Amino acid sequence: MKVGTDAVILGAAATLPSCENSLSPASQYAEDESFPLSTSDSVRRGIEVLDAGCGSGVIGLMVAQRLEAAGFREYDVTGVEIDSPAAEQAERNFGASPWSGHFKCLNVSMLGFAPETAYDFIVSNPPYYDDSLLPPDSRRSTARHTGGDAFGYPQLLEFAASGHLRAGGILALILPHQELTRLLRLAASYGLHAARLLHVRTTPSKEPSRLVAEFTLDTASGKAAGITPTEEYLTIQDASRFPQNKNSWTDEYLTLTREFYL
């Protein structure tokens, strides 16, 4: 599995879950005797992360790196991947990372995945092409095309809304920008509120080609319903800055990804 730009953008740009209902960064209250250290789930649990369709594990690894940089030490990242070679690669990558004790990879289909855990953060770069564009490589077909055993974003929305995303948790995914209208309509039908939309364009003169969308569950009182999401733009390249360099990354893209690229 190659490391694509979509995965890098999602892993770097997605909003990390709040520490409100989890162990605070580096357990900052651990030595504060005035802080009531309850053993209740709402105070003591760590952050639960799900990378749905994790491929080689790059997004989960980036999330772990960012959590560590933010001071979190209590978290678990579960990668679910239907493709056996990719799952094996993810296992190797997880095991070789400095945070190997926080990872596990399950070689199963998301369609049959029924965890008892609810997640604070669900992240995914899901399949999005329809079957009319199937490539000859069956593994690539499963990773990038809906239909069959593929777990596309409609299924991901349903999964998150079916008790697998905690109240206050975040579902983050990246899709072709053309899916925006359908995505928002489907999400609303499952009671998911669009909290943030990052429109990604390759150059300043082009329309956005990718969308990072983040969702939360609507509250029981309906307070989240109807709130306008935060909208942002990211431009990847600007050839006008350095005409002789075909990879003229913008400052904003370099700032976003500098901690991940070698």
Language-model features, listed with the residues they occupy:
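Conserved Class I SAM-dependent methyltransferase catalytic core
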Residues: V3, I9, D149-P208, A213
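Low-complexity, intrinsically disordered or signal/transmembrane-proximal segments
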Residues: Q28-Y29
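SAM/dcSAM-binding transferase cores
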Residues: E207-L262
